[in-house]
Amino acid sequence: MTDRYAVFGNPISHSKSPLIHGIFANETQQVLDYEAILAPKDGFESCLKLFWSQNGKGANVTAPFKEQAFNLCDELSEEAKLAGAVNTLTLLTNGKVRGDNTDGLGLVADLIRNISSLEGKRVLLLGAGGAARGSVLPLLKAGLKVYIHNRTQEKAEKLVEIFTPFGDVKALSIAELIAPFDIIINSTSSSLSGDVPAIPSCVIGVESLCYDMMYSKEMTSFNSWALELGAVKAIDGLGMLVGQAAKSFELWRGVTPEVDTTIKLLREKIKSE
């Protein structure tokens, strides 16, 4: 029987994961099935159990189930433990379930694709929700100095408390945003509504790279704003999406897919939709 993989979410029809993993499987000559599964909001656990019983080998998890998936794991990676959420599940040969969080790893991989060196650079991370929390440890491990700004200062300070043992991380109030950063990452959902975070424009300089975790057919509102302010480059989150999927695929199959072609194909598909 063919090994089965899936992405669980609600809603899930928008997911690009089946397309991405299909491309990865073809590229690496892996024989597998990958599907999108709409789990009832109150029935994720039973849905997952059924999947494991029917030759499920691994699963991706998206909203609103990442925290619930975390609680269903027998083992957790360091990234998952600190993120408090899981986006990748693997059924181990002993029957136990391992949880990983590859979101931040995908972000760092995409940053490395676009910048020659991350070591020592100062990054302003906007937002302190799940997307931000899943990114802090990989950013610190990459040698970045992380500064977190959130509308609610206490949330930013909570992340600092969690991640201080792992590197140089600080919370900044809006009054402390007074100079440009090397990298500005928008982990908020502001671009979904065509808005930009309420931050002073001085944080973006002529050598700043700006990164929006959102992606769309057109340039995101955050990236348009950043380029208008003179940012040297603005990148959306499509590469992060493909990057986190590549890390999941590697965990499951033991092979590392090449991401550049997949990003290009996905970009073309999104523009044609």
UniProtKB/Swiss-Prot annotation:
Q: Where does shikimate bind?
A: S15, K16, S17, T62, N87, D103, Y215
Instruction: Write out the entry's keywords from A to Z.
Output: Amino-acid biosynthesis, Aromatic amino acid biosynthesis, NADP, Oxidoreductase
Q: What is its EC number?
A: 1.1.1.25
GO cellular component assignments: cytosol
Q: Give the matching InterPro entries.
A: Aminoacid_DH-like_N_sf, NAD(P)-bd_dom_sf, SDH_C, Shikimate_DH, Shikimate_DH-bd_N, Shikimate_DH_fam, Shikm_DH/Glu-tRNA_Rdtase
Stored Gene3D superfamilies = Leucine Dehydrogenase, chain A, domain 1, NAD(P)-binding Rossmann-like Domain
Gene Ontology process terms (BP): amino acid biosynthetic process; aromatic amino acid family biosynthetic process; chorismate biosynthetic process; shikimate metabolic process
Q: What quaternary arrangement does the UniProt entry report? A: Homodimer.
Family in the record: Belongs to the shikimate dehydrogenase family.
Q: What is this protein called?
A: Shikimate dehydrogenase (NADP(+))
